[in-house]
Every structure is written in C-alpha cells, then in structure tokens.
Amino acid sequence: MIFLKIFMPMLTAHTIKILQSLDKKKFRQKYNLFLVEGDKIIRELKNSSYKVQEIFSTDISNPDFQSFKTNLITERELRKISLLQNPKNSIAVCELRENTSIEAPIQLVLDNVQDPGNLGTIIRLADWFGIEQIVCSEDCVDFYKPKVIQATMGSFTRVNVIYKDIAALLQNSDRPVFGTDMVGQSLYKTDFPERFYLILGNEGNGIRPEIKKLVSQNITIPRFGKLQHTESLNVSMAAGIILGQIFSKK
C-alpha cells in the first residue's frame, strides 16, 4: 500500500499571488521558484536534481507523488494558480537550479532565441540525441518560463541549460565552432569532430555579426525543392535536421 504525505492547505490570497507571479522572470528569480504543470512532466522530477518544495493536485492517488509533500486542492483553486490556458490537474513548485556549467562533448549554443516553443523543442531534441548541455546567450528567453517547460515535455530535467556571455565562452575555447547560416558548407558534406559547439541563431536575424566572427565553419541545410521559395527554416526544425545528420554518422 502506498502512503502519500497529503495536506489540506489553506491557499491564502498571498500564496496564490506568489504562485501567479511566477509567470514572470523577475518573480521567479525573486522567490527562486518555478512551476511545473501536469502529472507526466512532474513524474520526470522524481529522478532529477531539481528540488520540489510541494505539489498542489486535485488527484491525490498518483503514486509518483509519494516522495513529495502533496496538497489536495479543488478545481477552482487549481484554476487560480495555474499559469496555463488549459490547466493540468497537478502543479509542482520547484526551486531554480544553479547556473553551473558541466563538461559535455557536444554543446548547443543559442544566440538570442526568443520563442518559448523553439527553446522547449530544442531542449527536447538535445535530450533525444543525448546532448547534455545547452548554452544560452543572456538575452535568450528564460527556460523556466511556463511555455518553455511545457514544450520540453520533461526533457529539461535531463539537459543542463545555462546562461552566459557566449562571445566570451567561444573566444576562450579551443573547440571548433559551427554556425548555422543560409550560406555555408552543406551540412551533408561536413564532418564533425567529437567535441564542438553548434550555434543556432535568433528566429528573425540569425547569428549576430559579433558572434559570427567566432565561427570556425558555417554550415547550411541545402534546399532541394524545385522552386526554392522557402526563405528559411524554423530554428528548432533546423536543429532537428542538423542533429539527425550529425548522429547518423555515429
């Protein structure tokens, strides 16, 4: 028999206000907290390095919650604290992780990626291909944003995402740096070493000129359509194609 630590909380106006405020980066940083919504994604937290403060749920029968403090709430209360348009039945309150770099052979470097869905998808792709770290420029969308967390489908628990000055990172590294560009060597004719950085640029502007100067090799995904009217690929689509090609040779 499974015993859960069940609590009937008093969801005060103050608590609700704090949880609602976590939709914004400045309050996530102020309280050092972010929300994870939905049983499927919360399940991924169990074997991760993230610390779960507590869970609010309308369904207390989930055995995955047994190691967490779990608060039984009503549907009405759930709608008040959820940051999603269509609330899931459970919300985990988690602590932000330290912005600490790890050693990983292949690392993605994101230059000013702004769309939450793109960042979430790229994190999910990194998890799929076994890439352990993504380095984001300091002006990238915050990966603790609810839409990013949802788009990762739990992959954020297995990929280390950090924010730093990417120009300084690349300048001080001896790794080859591959940059995605509309003009460059064909992806399908490029040989990738064991250790390297792969830069993916902003949705509308690509990689910034000052970062382009630090690229060792520009690569491009060639177009095969007869009319070739498509101007560019979505950054997360491009990431999927490039990673698929890289790992097809391993």
Q: Where are these predicted regions, by residue range?
A:
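Glycine/small-residue-rich loop that forms an oxyanion/phosphate-binding "nest" at active or ligand-binding sites
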Residues: 72-94
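Amphipathic alpha-helical repeat scaffolds
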Residues: 38, 114-122, 230-236
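Active-site/ligand-binding-proximal alpha/beta "capping" segment
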Residues: 179-229
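Active-site regions of enzymes building and remodeling cell-envelope glycoconjugates
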Residues: 65-76, 105-106, 177, 191-197, ...
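Short beta->alpha connector loops at strand-helix junctions that form conserved
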Residues: 73-74, 111, 137-138, 160, ...
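Structured adenosyl-cofactor binding patch, chiefly the S-adenosyl-L-methionine
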Residues: 128-129, 143, 148-157, 209-250
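RNA substrate-binding interface of SAM-dependent RNA methyltransferases
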Residues: 47, 101-185
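Boundary-proximal intrinsically disordered activation/regulatory segments immediately upstream
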Residues: 3-58, 141
